[in-house]
Amino acid sequence: MPRVTVLMPTYNVAPYVKEAIESVLRQRYRDFELLVVDDASTDDTLAVVRSIDDPHIRIAAFDNNVGLAENLNRGLALIDTEYVARMDGDDIAEPFWLEKEVAVLDSHPEIGICSGGFERFGTVQSLVRFPERHEDCMANMLFECSVIVPTFRMSLYRDHGLRYRTDAFPAEDYRFWAECLRVTKIYNLQETLFHYRMHPTQICTARRKEQQRKVAEVRRYMLEWLSPDFTEEEKSYYTGQFMAPQIASRQDYNERKSFCGRLVAKNRSVGHFDEAALRHRLDKHLRLTLYSTIVERYFKEGYSIPKYLHYLFGGLALKTGWHYEIRFLLKSLLLKGN
C-alpha cells in the first residue's frame, strides 16, 4: 500500500484534467496513488482520465452528482493511506509538491497539515503566500483560508471524525481547515508548489456571491472559537463592516480599531490564539483597508500629484481631517508589504 493518496475530485474538467493528472504522475516522490473521484461529469472528463494508462491511477466514478463537498467525503471513505494530498482536476502541481510536503509531515509529528505557496494563472495572474508559522496561520484564518493543495494526515479523518460540510459549500475547504485547526497544526512552505488555474467556469468564479456568504459563516465560526462571549451584534459587525475592504469615515476606522482591542482582550481569557500573531494580523487588516481606501479614493482615476494634493488639502478627504489622511497614507504605503 502506498503512503500517500492524491485525492482529485472531478466534475466537467475535460479540457484541463489531463494536464493536472500528468503533473501528479511527474512527482519525484513516488510512493503514492492518484484517486480520481468523478462526480457524474456530463462532459468527457472520465474518458480523458481513462485514456491515461498508469498504475498509480485509481478511478472512482459515480452516477449521482452530490456536489464537491460530499464528493470529497466519498473519496476520503475510499482511502486507507497514511497521508492524503488534496488537488483539483484543473490545477498543475510542481514535481516536488509531494516530496516537500511529505518531508515536513515526516519530520514534524505535531504538524497535521502541510501546505505551500501557489501561482494563479489564466484569467488572473499572481503569486500567493500564506503565513509560514502555525500561530500566524491561525490568526490569518480569522480572515481567510490559509491552506491550499495540502498534504494532511489521514488520522484527522479517522480519529477526529472531520468531514467536508456540504452546508459550507462553496467554502467547504475553508471550513474544513478551520475545524482541523482545533486538533492539529498547520505549516506553510514559502515556495510555489503548484499552479492554480483561474477560469470563468470554476466554482469560485461562477458562484462568487454565495462563496462570500459562506466565507462569512466560517469567519463567524473562527470568531466564536476565539471567544464564545461575543454578542450576535458583535458577530454581525465582525463579518460585515469590520471586514469591508474600505473605510467609510474616521468613526468607522476608530470603531474597527476599538474592535481589534476587544478581540485581543477576549483572546486572553481563552488563549487559543498567540497574542503577538493576533495583534500583527489585526494591524495588517487595518493597514490594508486604509491602503485600499486611499488608493480607491485618490489614485484610481490617475490624479496628478498637484491635483491629488489639492484634493487632499481641500478638505474633501472623507471628512476625516488632513492629518489623519497623510499619516495613514504614509503608514499604509510604507507597511503594506509586511
Residue ranges and their predicted role:
Residues D38-A47, N64, D88:
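A conserved acidic beta->alpha catalytic loop
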Residues P15-K18, D43-S51, I92, F96:
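Acidic helix N-cap motif at the loop->helix transition within catalytic regions
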Residues M1-L25:
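N-proximal low-complexity "stem/linker" segments adjacent to membrane-targeting elements
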Residues V84:
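Short aromatic/hydrophobic "clamp" motif used to bind/position activated sugar donors
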Residues A77, G116, H134-F242:
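Conserved nucleotide-sugar donor-binding catalytic segment
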Residues F96-V128:
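Conserved donor NDP-sugar-binding/catalytic core segment of glycosyltransferases
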Residues F62-I79, K100:
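Glycine-rich, basic loop-to-helix element that forms the pyrophosphate-binding segment
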Residues M198-N338:
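C-terminal subregions of glycosyltransferases and related glycan-biosynthesis enzymes
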